[in-house]
Amino acid sequence: MPQIKSAIKRVKTNATANKRNAAELSKLRTAVRKFNEAVENDAKDVLDLEVKAARALDKAASKGLISKNKANRDKSRLSKKAANK
């Protein structure tokens, strides 16, 4: 356990940030999974789910959870999947 005041605060802020980051990553993965399931099941709301997944990817990239290049690469893959179905 840290003894220095600033180190104690960093432990608290790191724990808070960890919870926030885990929640955002979970939202991202859920959005992408729902899109993939809709594509596999030929659902009608594929385009709406694609937009939601792309938005989640952009949000994660802006918060530093994933890199900007990964977000763009994943969005490209989403749009290819949506176009092929």
From Swiss-Prot:
Membrane-crossing segments per the record: none
Record-stated family: Belongs to the bacterial ribosomal protein bS20 family.
Provenance organism: Lactobacillus johnsonii (strain CNCM I-12250 / La1 / NCC 533)
GO molecular function: small ribosomal subunit rRNA binding; structural constituent of ribosome
Superkingdom of this protein's organism: Bacteria
Function: Binds directly to 16S ribosomal RNA.
Coiled coil residues, start to end: none
Alphabetical keyword list: Ribonucleoprotein, Ribosomal protein, RNA-binding, rRNA-binding
InterPro entries, sorted: Ribosomal_bS20, Ribosomal_bS20_sf
GO (cellular component) term, any one: cytosol
Cystines in this chain: none
Keyword Signal: no
Residues in the signal sequence: none
Protein name: Small ribosomal subunit protein bS20
Lineage, top ranks: Bacteria, Bacillati, Bacillota, Bacilli, Lactobacillales
GO biological process, one term: translation
Annotated PANTHER family: 30S RIBOSOMAL PROTEIN S20, SMALL RIBOSOMAL SUBUNIT PROTEIN BS20C
